[in-house]
């Protein structure tokens, strides 16, 4: 039983500022790395290198934006890995995936902070990112490629290309799902979601990790206490 009445329109923190900054840095680096990578792999798209000035500049920048992308991702991975460990409760989501696609996720699954689909994507992107980093270093002509034999370089190129495709596909799915689930974009842009959204899409996260902290924040607010809240979103800079 809740200690205090909580409106479904109450705003709660979904992603804090450091995570959102890292996420959008990752987005920028992803597109810069993707555009240059596609241009190198497919000659018909060589014009994409002109976005950064010249093909030479694009080739020089590509590995560095890739490394920045990797570290931005790793920060997020370390921040959220414990929320992405598969658990027995995820089986309900898998069995009810058709209902999930119909928009009835709340009727078949009791999700924590992330559902099974998000967890699968998380670990897929981890695999792709690590493979891209390792193979990219092997292929980096200016510094490292001369240390490796031609067969190793060929395998690295093949794995790099496959991992890039895996990453690109995963990001497309991520973008589509973010727009498909209304309210998700706001969570990563502004950092907050409503209690209604949390109850519908991630009810166990709301019950186990948010509710008690939210009650405390609201009680403090009612009693006139000021300061940093735990989960209650009070606006930027507050």
From Swiss-Prot:
Heme b 1 binds at residues 23, 174. One of its GO terms (molecular function) is formate dehydrogenase (NAD+) activity. It comes from the Bacteria. Binds 2 heme groups per subunit. Heme 1 is located at the cytoplasmic interface, heme 2 is located at the periplasmic interface. Electrons are transferred from the periplasmic to the cytoplasmic heme. Its main location: membrane. Keywords: Cell membrane, Electron transport, Heme, Iron, Membrane, Metal-binding, Transmembrane, Transmembrane helix, Transport. It is a multi-pass membrane protein. Its cofactor is heme. The chain crosses the membrane at residues 23-43, 60-80, 120-140, 155-175. It is found in: Cell membrane. Heme b 2 binds at residues 62, 160. SUPFAM superfamilies: Transmembrane di-heme cytochromes. GO terms for biological process: anaerobic respiration; formate oxidation; respiratory electron transport chain. GO terms for cellular component: formate dehydrogenase complex; plasma membrane. Belongs to the formate dehydrogenase gamma subunit family. Allows to use formate as major electron donor during anaerobic respiration. Subunit gamma is probably the cytochrome b556(FDO) component of the formate dehydrogenase. Formate dehydrogenase is a membrane-bound complex, formed by subunits alpha, beta and gamma. This is Formate dehydrogenase, cytochrome b556 subunit. It comes from Haemophilus influenzae (strain ATCC 51907 / DSM 11121 / KW20 / Rd).
């Amino acid at each position: 039983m809740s200690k205090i009445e909580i409106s479904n329109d109450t705003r709660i923190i979904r992603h804090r500022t450091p995570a959102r900054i890292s996420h959008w840095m990752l987005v920028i680096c992803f597109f810069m790395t993707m555009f240059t990578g596609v241009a190198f792999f497919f000659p018909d798209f060589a014009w994409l290198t002109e976005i950064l000035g010249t093909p030479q500049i694009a080739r020089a920048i590509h590995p560095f934006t890739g490394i920045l992308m990797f570290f931005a991702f790793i920060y997020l991975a370390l921040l959220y890995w414990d929320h992405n460990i598969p658990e027995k409760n995820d089986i309900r989501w898998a069995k009810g995936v058709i209902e999930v696609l119909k928009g009835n996720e709340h009727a078949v699954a009791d999700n924590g902070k992330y559902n099974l689909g998000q967890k699968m994507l998380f670990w897929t992107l981890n695999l792709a990112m690590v493979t891209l980093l390792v193979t990219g270093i092997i292929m980096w002509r200016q510094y490292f490629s001369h240390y490796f034999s031609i067969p190793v370089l060929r395998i690295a190129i093949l794995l790099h290309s496959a991992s890039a495709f895996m990453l690109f596909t995963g990001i497309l799915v991520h973008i589509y799902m973010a727009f498909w689930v209304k309210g998700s974009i706001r969570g990563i842009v502004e950092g907050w979601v409503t209690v209604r959204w949390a109850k519908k899409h991630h009810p166990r996260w709301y019950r186990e990790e948010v509710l008690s902290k939210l009650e405390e924040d609201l009680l403090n607010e009612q009693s006139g206490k000021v300061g940093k809240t735990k989960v209650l979103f009070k606006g930027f800079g507050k």
